Design a protein with these regions (language model features):
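P-loop NTPase motor core of the ASCE superfamily
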Residues: 85-87, 107-208
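Acidic, glycine-rich active-site loops and adjacent beta-strand->loop/helix elements
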Residues: 75, 103-105
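Conserved beta-strand segments of the P-loop GTPase G domain that flank and frequently precede/overlap
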Residues: 32-33, 70, 100, 128-130
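P-loop NTPase motor domains
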Residues: 1-95, 111, 163, 172-199, ...
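Structural recognition of the conserved hydrophobic beta-strand(s) that form the central parallel beta-sheet
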Residues: 96-102
């Protein structure tokens, strides 16, 4: 089993220690690239590396500096042992998490619905891009809650003029999410009203 997991670069004698790098700080950046070809085979290794880093960040007695975790395609790392504690309790210890997910069902499938809900609810700020599945849209809508809306429209009956109707609705509706253009997101910061934000296309700096 071990021979099947430790393939490629993971067969070599390593010089990198996740625990030491987190403990010693120094502004180091660690890239762990997921190999789509053999990623499923290497998942235990990826999971171990990330779990070790999270555990080390949580083992500090106080905030000894920030440790940032940027994880894209979070569903590819199922069953991280310390992720729930990291997201929900690591903030006071300087552990910061930024996750990219395609939809909420993927996280529920990887971690179970209850644990997935606990993980997602632990994030302070959400950037909601356009999603097509109903479950993810429902999550975004429920996250921002409801309000009272005043709708104004012309009456279908002649001579009645303008009609006003008060109804309860979501702060962000399905149409708000599905009509988002590429690169635009609805930002949901804690304690503030949501707003739209257009990201600019990244351009490499021009060397002088």
């Amino acid at each position: 089993m071990i021979r099947e997991i430790f393939v490629g670069n993971f067969r070599k004698n390593g010089t990198l220690s996740m625990r030491q790098l987190v403990r010693n700080k120094g502004g180091r950046v660690i890239f762990v690239e997921y190999d789509l070809g053999i990623g499923a085979m290497l998942t235990p290794v990826y999971r171990l590396l990330i779990d070790l880093a999270i555990k080390e960040a949580l083992c500090r007695t106080s905030n000894e500096g920030n440790v940032y975790f940027f994880i894209d395609e979070f569903r590819l790392l199922p069953h991280l042992e310390h992720i729930d504690d990291g997201v929900n309790f690591g903030r006071s210890l300087g552990a910061k998490f930024v996750f990219g997910i395609q939809n909420t069902d993927q996280i529920a499938a990887a971690y179970g619905r209850d644990l997935a809900h606990s993980i997602l609810s632990g994030f302070g700020t959400t950037f909601a891009f356009r999603v097509n599945d109903a479950e993810s849209r429902e999550y975004i809508k429920e996250l921002l809650g409801k309000n009272i809306k005043l709708q104004t429209f012309m009456s279908a009956v002649q001579n009645r003029g303008v009609t006003e109707q008060i109804r309860e609705g979501y702060v962000v509706e399905d149409s708000d999410i599905t009509n988002l253009p590429v690169g635009q997101a609805i930002v949901c910061p804690p304690g503030c009203l949501p707003f739209r934000f257009q990201f600019r296309l990244y351009e490499s700096p021009v060397s002088s």
